[in-house]
Amino acid sequence: MNKDEKLQITKDKLIDSTFRLMEEKDDPMSVTSREIAAMAGVKPGMINYCFGSRENLIYQTFQKQYLDFLKEKETEEIIRSDVPPKEILKKLHFIVAGCLVENPKFTKAVSGFVLFKRDLGRESFSYPYVYRHYEGKKTEAECRLIAYELSTMMQLIIYRSEDFRKDFGIDLTNPEELKHYIDMRIDLLLA
């Protein structure tokens, strides 16, 4: 086994251990580097070596779960469908928001990282559809920015879902209200 394969095995162990520990806790961000390393059977320094920080490991753990979720059959059917990109975005964001609403403790755990520390150069799942929607009428940078705004706004609304219910009367746990809100947001940003 070569060095890269061993490193990938270590990364996978760290991600799996992080996910299991986060599921056990009321506050997923309270998971410590030492707990993660102990469960993974590696030294705590491997977290920084592999991921740069505990926060990035937590984010990567969330990303793995999120990407697995996006590979589900329903999502693949939407992506392959022959509907306009804006409609694909509405459907995908509704599915993703549903996942985020169902897992509020994970959403809250990664929101700070997503909003303040995530590499903005990384492509979001929304970008290709935003770009196709504008068909060259906006630059690549403008389309990336719109995709980023869609992503960050989704994180914020889910993070503050109780405030949305209290202050605006929008119950994001109600699928119809969630869909209406997402459609409205996408219509505003992709006018």
Give the label of every model feature segment.
Residues 6, 10-19, 36, 61-65, ...:
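Generic hydrophobic, amphipathic alpha-helix propensity
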Residues 13, 35, 56, 91, ...:
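Amphipathic alpha-helical interaction segments
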Residues 13, 21-56, 60:
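Helix-turn-helix
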Residues 23-29, 69, 73-75, 161-177:
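Short, flexible, glycine-rich and Lys/Arg-enriched loop motifs at helix boundaries
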Residues 60, 74-106, 140, 146-147:
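Hydrophobic alpha-helical connector segments
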Residues 70-73, 111-145, 176, 180:
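Amphipathic alpha-helical packing segments from all-alpha helical-bundle domains
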Residues 94-120, 161-163:
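Amphipathic alpha-helical segments used for helix-helix packing
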Residues 128-140, 159-191:
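C-terminal peripheral helix-coil segments that are non-catalytic and often amphipathic
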